[in-house]
Amino acid sequence: MARKKKKNSFFGWTAAIIIGIASFITGKNWTEWDTTQTLIEGLNQQADTSRMEIPIKKEGQGQIIQRTGYTLSYDAKNKTPQWVAWELTKEETRGNEERTNEFQPDPEVIGAKVVTYDYSGSGYDRGHMAPAGDMKWSKKAMQESFYMSNICPQDHNLNTEDWNDLEMKSREWARRYGKVYIVCGPVYNGGRNEYIGSHRVKVPDAFFKVILINDTKKQAALGFYFENEAGERPLSEYLISVDSLEKLTGMDFFPALPDEEENLLEKEIVNKLP
């Protein structure tokens, strides 16, 4: 498992020092979003796009946080991730770590930190982006999957039914094809203007997930788009071309693929699941 990187706390410590100095000098409230965003941009962070699962956000890149089992870009304005990306291997699906169910503020998030109580009484689930079920191979990976930076307000029925069905299907594909690369996150398209909790976590309009199967036996890029509402529909009804999702999200998925290969896979409209 040499590919797994220990989380690098350099950016977290650097940000903490910047915030501490700035607060001492000015005494201003550094939880304000525009100030937080300025600090994030000042770090000049870059995600490792040589890794197959890492996307490129064309505008407004968030705070990059590297975890044991996934990487995310955190949106300080909406208090949710922009995207969460990870590789899931056949071996990792055989893990037996138990869920902790201990939702915690993310210690590396710059600025205001979402807490589990922001979701209390909201009517929304604490919806994992990188699922706990994909992190059973490591105690640390499991614990980190419960950081609130990996969570979005999600319709209960969607979280427990169709979204969960796709998580299980992804593990099935990882076992069948050796590994899969996954990116997912919320979609904000202006359809609703709803916030929850004292930290004003913005409720997504929808969610996307893209899955790359890049095996000698099978190669496919699957795009899924879920409205943030009850569904209970076949997963095939959520399929959408990856090209369409790139336009919706402003992201470039799987940029590590050769251009010709990437273009061919992403423009394909898949009508059925592998």
Protein language model regions, located:
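Domain-level detector for secreted/extracellular nuclease and nuclease-toxin modules, and
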Residues: 2-274
